[in-house]
């Protein structure tokens, strides 16, 4: 038994160290190298097999001492590993290149050999979808025709199906999944990745489902070790607690406005302009909504250098030469910064053009998509999107403000300068549509605010006459503008996060009953304030959108924060930990929502990233990180208590860390596998050994060790505290280190 346990520990440690080394090697040797020589190599699979078999035998030998919930947890991981083994043994992958009208029944595998598909597939059409109003590519769509010939004996007819594949839409036929990978320079050919895994995905999903059920059972079962740890963590009464001071400082360094003349657009005129309605994202909305999204998209927040989003947006319309030189476009990726030739992360629109008036990222992006270089695509996509957002504004796609109702009662919206065709309009209306924005620009530049206000009023009146059936009421417009202003304020969320984190730390470490009572009272007040704030936001969003706010990742996160607060306030009297951590969980959900809204989807770009699964995945992972952070802080306090020979306090804090460890590990496990499901639905594979997901797995394995009570070294409180403190380095590496030092498809920097 002892030797078997040592084998498990040695193999688990070896796996963790190998995974760490692999991510470092990948940054220098490339993904293909580590995938071939480490991740999918036979020796690494054997190592995982030894670990799984040894763990299974050890559990069976100790099954009388292991609860049903713990058995289910371990069984689920074994099933997940079995699914991975099945995929490794039976799954097929390869590439398929087709020209227009060409038919094939084979694919090329990783070794370059041709393998039969069992059906015929032909390229019906390949199409590049551009950003609206521009010639810049937004998506790549392949339309295939797949056909399986019927059996001559059974006289079955042929089974023919049309399949559409795009960047974020996987095509499927007879168990084979098609993923868009590249295209030919003449637009007459396409390259597709093919993946066929008839058994592995199903087995793995079964393991995921069993894991979720077993983790929930473990958390709420009365017979598991977590209950004992909970009682032990709260057993010490009357001990003197020392104050913990946490200083959180946030510094934002923004580039200063360039020292040149510019048109100072009056804030009042900009606000009036912001209430004009436009057709935006298939919805009639005030320009203020477009302005808020536009400015937030470019610089990460809804204002710039003290100017409101309305003023900045109006500036991009009425004072183009100046704003094209302002370095307000945030470029996060180093590769994009290098290609644009900028120092730091701030660029102007002028930085996107070379001396010959060529778009600097055009050639690298086309080559990346042609070659299927997903890493380079990812590095340049965000900068390219921001560039094209500005071009869309110039093309009038964000300023469709003139409605026209035809004889069929269908309402069309036109932008200033857009060809009107043969519309039944009198000469006065035609002149108004064509010239009103020119007159408004002239008034704004000349500082004639009275005339500008009058023109805005006329545009607004025209909208209500020509688009009466669809133009929102004045109350709805003012409500949406008010919602945008409230929602753009990020400081309340940072305040909630700071206060809830401080209160959680105080509630978990402070042992003085009177101070605990005060902390719990403040937690309740904070929960009520957060609930009122979140309810107002959700209600306003519900009203202005006309539907329940649960349609995208941002709304899902806000709703989850609201639901968490409801549960907290309903159950806080009976379950103290819910009172302690409910506001913190809610604050993290609001933080994820804020991060999501910090990169708003002005156009339908990368719709897969709007998946609620992705938002839940990020939220769950982040909350596990928060708990790991708390355990690191508790570890510091525990080591201080050990140094001062406060044995009782040291033991209690160790029990508290172990108590928090259960939900933390459960959350990171659930988060990882929700992410795997999302990846499978979106990209065709549930696990790709990306550096970020590999380090998340490393973190989960590291934090899983203290859950096993038979590891003698961790039974000492001092060792537990030291382990928790050092283990947090893996969290820092996962969240920050991977983004800045390693390669990969994830980036949260």
Sequence positions of predicted segments:
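Solvent-exposed, non-transmembrane regions of integral membrane proteins
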Residues: 1-749
